[in-house]
Amino acid sequence: MKTISRQAYADMFGPTTGDRLRLADTELFLEIEKDFTTYGEEVKFGGGKVIRDGMGQSQVVSAECVDVLITNAIILDYWGIVKADIGIKDGRIVGIGKAGNPDVQPNVDIVIGPGTEVVAGEGKIVTAGGIDTHIHFICPQQAQEGLVSGVTTFIGGGTGPVAGTNATTVTPGIWNMYRMLEAVDELPINVGLFGKGCVSQPEAIREQITAGAIGLKIHEDWGATPMAIHNCLNVADEMDVQVAIHSDTLNEGGFYEETVKAIAGRVIHVFHTEGAGGGHAPDVIKSVGEPNILPASTNPTMPYTINTVDEHLDMLMVCHHLDPSIPEDVAFAESRIRRETIAAEDILHDMGAISVMSSDSQAMGRVGEVILRTWQCAHKMKLQRGTLAGDSADNDNNRIKRYIAKYTINPALAHGIAHTVGSIEKGKLADIVLWDPAFFGVKPALIIKGGMVAYAPMGDINAAIPTPQPVHYRPMYACLGKAKYQTSMIFMSKAGIEAGVPEKLGLKSLIGRVEGCRHITKASMIHNNYVPHIELDPQTYIVKADGVPLVCEPATELPMAQRYFLF
């Protein structure tokens, strides 16, 4: 058998089993665990290459071949780090394996035909589109910013740049829900909208779920009282939707213990569990130790750096409609900013005790930095805590799988949409992001939405080739015309779908049904289901997990930062 060197093979078809790649400029290294190809039968498009008539391309009609093929991709997902071809049909992933022409090639399970378009995945890392579960719908331009960062699903609430939305992720009531569903129908991104769960009687909640909400949000600015929590969870259990909560920072309606009692062992998604974004001061972080609570972070505190504390006070005053001239407002803000709990948050992520990452977009968080800050935290923790259990000196595969799950599969599981999005798996919507390894987590090479390119870095439009400067991210065809309706999805409750909301409003986007929200626990959070016993000293704010103090230094320098954003 003829052989070539690993370097020559990698240059031609991308790395293969046993090869390692550095993620951006971090100290994180992945190692390819398996290659689905048959060596010598790889497919590649181009002049003099394999995917040509009678060679790698068969004669079948469109019904018998994939619509889109990503060749020789390095798939990075919660379930593995592998090299494979990815087949897409009707906007969904239908194959992960070996592509080619079965008439002349062996071991083909993804058929290439005249109806197949090719995306070159050689040397590229491929991930599922990110899911951000903490979106304040303050402005529609967030969709572009999220997409070009690699996020393809927004879950949250709001109605625009008004006081209620600047502070809370809530789309309240039937009229607001209908108008926002009509508006987000035009966005080239998947969307789910939260109704308001801050009410002590059930009917006002039921009507919002029936109006098309994906779930419910309880927020202290609207009242996160024990009765509201109890009532909201009762309706959520009845109608199979998730509840997210920003609990009572001021402890006015009750302390942390009263909130836990009102939750009563039922599943709930706790936002910014560390507390700087809001929640029982100073001990909301103890919710990380509850088996029924799905804990999440928002990105302004992630990772802990020398600048983290300083920027938070002003952000908080703006977002929560506070007045710096009122001492009580200043005290409220200061009660939420604790460097000790912010430091502990990084470590809890690395232990797999905090399950989800999100943004808190324009409301103390940055919509385009969910993915970037997740990997900055992973890098910081490797430097400060060393190799993760199960990893080796050669690769960080376990740590990498843990961190990618935080913004892909786990938020999908938390909100009942994992049957449709959240991973690179057969049957799921083809929301796929391609990365050059040197730019991983920072600037995608291609954002595919529902099987079609939505955004891409594109050079001078009047140039003879696509690459000359200036290169900017620009909207592509999946964002235009009727195509955007066939490549993006609005998620809503079963009750909303059965009530005919999509038909009543004339929604054109794909409609995704929420299911299975109420029977999950923290144990369902993949690679991030550790339930430690959490203690917090109310005087020093030092956090302990299973008796061990969680202390780390702030970072003075981070990867994936200035050197990537000079231009």
UniProtKB/Swiss-Prot annotation:
Gene3D superfamilies on file: Metal-dependent hydrolases, Urease, subunit C, domain 1
Outcome of substituting residue 472 to L: Reduces activity 12-fold
Keyword field contains Metal-binding: yes
Major enzyme class: hydrolase
Keywords per UniProt: Cytoplasm, Hydrolase, Metal-binding, Nickel, Virulence
Binding locations of substrate: 219
Modified residues (N6-carboxylysine): 217
Recorded GO MF terms: nickel cation binding; urease activity
Pathway linked to the protein: Nitrogen metabolism; urea degradation; CO(2) and NH(3) from urea (urease route): step 1/1
Taxonomy, superkingdom: Bacteria
Positions that bind Ni(2+) 2: 217, 246, 272
Annotated positions binding Ni(2+) 1: 134, 136, 217, 360
PANTHER family to which the protein is assigned, alphabetical: UREASE (PTHR43440:SF1)
Oligomeric form and interacting partners: Probable heterotrimer of UreA (gamma), UreB (beta) and UreC (alpha) subunits. Three heterotrimers associate to form the active enzyme. The trimeric urease interacts with an accessory complex composed of UreD, UreF and UreG, which is required for the assembly of the nickel containing metallocenter of UreC. The UreE protein may also play a direct role in nickel transfer to the urease apoprotein.
Protein name in UniProt: Urease subunit alpha
Upper classification of the organism: Bacteria, Pseudomonadati, Pseudomonadota, Gammaproteobacteria, Enterobacterales
Gene designation per UniProt: ureC
